[in-house]
Amino acid sequence: MTSVVKRIATGSSVLAVLPANEDPVEFPGDYFLQNPGKIRVCINRKLDVATLRQYVYEGLKNGDVHVCHINSYLYQVLKDTRDEAQSDWISFGVSLAVKGGIVSVFDTLMIEDYRGEAPDGRKCDGRTIDDDKWLPMLILGLYRVSRATQEDYKKSLLQKLYAQCKLRSPQAEELVEDAAEFYEVWSNDSNFLKLVAAIDMFFHKFKNHADAGLRWGTIVSRFKDCAALATLSHVQKVTGLSIKEVFTWVLNKSVEDELCRMMKERQEVDKADSYMPYLIDFGISTKSPYSSVKNPCFHFWGQLTALLVHSHRAKNARVPEDIPYNELTTAAWLFAYAMGRSSGLEQRFTTDDSYYQEDEDINKGLGVKAPTTRDVQMWLAWWSDIGKVPTQDMETFARREVLGLTEIRSKTIGEYAKKTFSV
């Protein structure tokens, strides 16, 4: 939309524009309109699993395994993993299974031959089929470890990964050192990411499968770069409101715009067995419309609201840059205060036909007294009556909520709230 202003001195029109410095978001539905069918992945299928097992083992041990061998090994070892579909499985018009049919772990993919050069690996003696019980867990678990950003947490994850491997086979070995980083480059390989996503998508669908424990490593692929969606779900849970009621508490245009974009129809956001949660690793989208980066105002508003209604995890959410902090803070503050001053308590059962019903007029004509319901209209009327300036009780409420915050990280919602409300 173009914006035109008038220059007072001359009466001439001036076009007001900003530089287009951001790439547009890419929705999963648009991808499948342009690329109908299953996700394509390229795998080198020339080597047998016995040779690949040796290459992968020695490569992990020495820190020089080639991702092409990793992909081929995962494919060869897991391709026969199957389960029975309890219903038709369709996503974005792609038929993945029919009710009663047998579906395999990579049936979400269209497997094509890898045409690039595959270097030789290093062979070794003593590798057996028993290694196939734990090596895939180690490989997939390293993907999860590579996503960690804090060193202590990374080391902790690696130890937990080894425990998972030993559960699958007592012969599992700790091949990778704490300081190793060679496996982090696997995330640059689109074929590896697609295999990870396909594995997680399958075991999310078939949660009771004997090998569903492999999700320990792949689970971070699901809803990657969808932090804003997670924020929406979190706000709904911690406030106790329905999703519709949460929407009514959106008071800022910037939040409104971002939320409406996220709610674009026919994207299968609410379909659990869809391709959608894996839009990044499947290569469906390079700019997620559900990330905190693309929805900074909504993410900030939601996380600050959650923090002020006792959410411990919200304190570590990152504070976005270059957003209207003041108006977003006020909106989140009022929302949280309303939740803290009211409740959804009602009599839910009765022994006969009689039960307590609140007088509908109880909150009318309150003047400057805060409402006791969660009705946004009553709260906005009250907010207008008090001059749209936070009351002393609101300040006390916010100060009390941030008083006990400890172990606060830099540039987080916790730090922002502490500085804003503790004065």
Swiss-Prot record:
Annotated signal peptide: none
Keyword hit for Ribonucleoprotein: yes
Keywords from the UniProt entry: Capsid protein, Helical capsid protein, Host cytoplasm, Ribonucleoprotein, RNA-binding, Viral nucleoprotein, Virion
Location, primary (coarse class): virion
Compartments (UniProt record): Virion; Host cytoplasm
One Pfam assignment: Rhabdo_ncap
UniProt KW RNA-binding keyword: yes
Protein family: Belongs to the vesiculovirus nucleocapsid protein family.
Name of the protein in its database record: Nucleoprotein
Record organism: Isfahan virus
Source organism phylogeny: Viruses, Riboviria, Orthornavirae, Negarnaviricota, Haploviricotina
